């Protein structure tokens, strides 16, 4: 067993060896190294064919038309292109956007930028379980609403939003619907023909593909128009210029193909391991799960251990690679904005750890994790005066702390 144990699959996944092998065939002189836009010789044609195959594989994963897949550098760029692209193209229709407080920073910061440009954004507060009722979205809609952006699976707490119902609502009101599917694509079935989604952001490195490549699904029926952010050679039907990175795209395609075939067996095993982990630690006193347990991605577990400081717990769990909050914001010592939006106080938000399980997690690793967590929390609480006061029956909320 290799230490530290990797339990941070929501931050990134290792590249599947089958994916790495495919990528290696697209880099060197004896491989498919040409520029896919070179139309005058075989090197370009081979690269273009490799890109086309990958585009098909990614389209099949979400049941889209390959012409609806636009390659980007990742889900952050896809989110930016989708939200800014729609806002700028359809600004005559209105300047109101609806999103939620628990979205990824790539969506929230893009919306903040649009606010600086004169757009109006409504940030919905989810319920305590992390879910956003469709009625709440409907109540926020106005005549000038042009876009709704809601993620499918939350990166911190793993809850799944009802994008089918939200899609129906948006389509009936002729409002563009964007879904950030970075955490769900390749991990759960998605069918863009059934779900009325207009735009969907996808990332390769969350599904055992390489970093630095992603895609934006852009619906053709109804046709969604975007204002491009990257100008140049007119690649990707003018929506995203720049030479296509054949090796990354081929890796992305292979990762999507593997995800499609292995999804059921992967998820069954991952769910079993997640339940094993939760059953192994939920006997610890004052341990709470964050987010809805039913509407939840099978590999995700966000747990608050009361009276334990999250950062000190992370240090104590040096054998486990886990995180507090999302990888993009875990460097700041602010409590997670996602957990604060669920109504957790600062102390509980600070004492939370995200465990995310994936394709290469083993039973042995989960057993070791349970032991380590149980032992570390016991040790940290022994040192905590707050824990001692709590055990003595003192109501900590009623304590008047002196300010020196």
Swiss-Prot record:
Cited SUPFAM superfamilies: PLP-dependent transferases
Coiled coil: none
InterPro entries found in the cross-reference section: Aminotrans_V_dom (IPR000192), Aminotrans_V_PyrdxlP_BS (IPR020578), Cys_deSase_IscS (IPR010240), Cysteine_dSase (IPR016454), PyrdxlP-dep_Trfase (IPR015424), PyrdxlP-dep_Trfase_major (IPR015421), PyrdxlP-dep_Trfase_small (IPR015422)
Residues involved in pyridoxal 5'-phosphate binding: 75-76, 155, 183, 203-205, 243
Enzyme class: transferase
Family statement drawn from the similarity comment of this UniProt entry: Belongs to the class-V pyridoxal-phosphate-dependent aminotransferase family. NifS/IscS subfamily.
Protein name per the record: Cysteine desulfurase IscS
Organism of provenance: Shewanella piezotolerans (strain WP3 / JCM 13877)
